Amino acid sequence: MGRYIGPWVKLDRRFGVVVSGKKSAPKILARRNYPPGQHGRKYGRRKKLTEYGLRLMEKQKLKFLYGGLREKQFKKYFDMASKSKENTGEMLLQYLERRLDNVVYRLGFASTRRQARQLVAHGHVLVNGKKVNIPSYLVEPGDVIEIKEKSRDIPFIKENLENVDPRSIPSWLELDKDNFRGRVVRLPENVQEYLEIPINLQYIVEFYSKV
């Protein structure tokens, strides 16, 4: 499956929760809280899903929350998590959180994960002093993530940092705002406590166990 390129507000309306990360999305969803499409307003309520449909929906919500990952990539994280001795669902979230584009987003350099992916892909981000342009790069404890010096004058990066609330940064990360730099203190834990939307991880585990 290719990457989704349609309007992200439609995804918010499809799922009934904000997966786009856009600041305006909650207001739009409150005003148009019905499925997108020609008959969305007419029928209003979302169709009752089958057991399979519920599990598929939960998987899709998590994929799009993390920027619209391709199925192959998402399944790779699930397979890695399922081989761990730890809880599969929690390990899946840990791998997703450790993605470089997610860390750039969590530190406040980007306003959405999609914007963070672009920053990484276009070479604006350094890890331990070296350019890394792979959004899926998995960070490790001790890694230092920073915006390249020549990129620090990009208006939206400066604006994002000025508006970041230090309390919104997970405890496994540290931010040095003045130096456009962050550090991975430890591996992420209890991710569901600060995840932007509720996710039923058991549904995702059950989805892949039946396909």
UniProtKB/Swiss-Prot annotation:
Single GO BP term: ribosomal small subunit biogenesis
Classification via SUPFAM superfamilies: Alpha-L RNA-binding motif
The keyword Ribonucleoprotein is annotated on this UniProt entry: yes
S4 RNA-binding domain sequence ranges: 98-161
GO cellular component terms, semicolon-separated: small ribosomal subunit
Record InterPro entries: Ribosomal_uS4 (IPR022801), Ribosomal_uS4_bac-type (IPR005709), Ribosomal_uS4_CS (IPR018079), Ribosomal_uS4_N (IPR001912), S4_RNA-bd (IPR002942), S4_RNA-bd_sf (IPR036986)
Keyword set, alphabetical order: Ribonucleoprotein, Ribosomal protein, RNA-binding, rRNA-binding
Tree of life domain: Bacteria
A GO MF term: rRNA binding
Protein's job: One of the primary rRNA binding proteins, it binds directly to 16S rRNA where it nucleates assembly of the body of the 30S subunit. With S5 and S12 plays an important role in translational accuracy.
HAMAP family per UniProt: Ribosomal_uS4_B
Subunit field text: Part of the 30S ribosomal subunit. Contacts protein S5. The interaction surface between S4 and S5 is involved in control of translational fidelity.
Protein family: Belongs to the universal ribosomal protein uS4 family.
Name this polypeptide is given: Small ribosomal subunit protein uS4
Gene that encodes the chain: rpsD
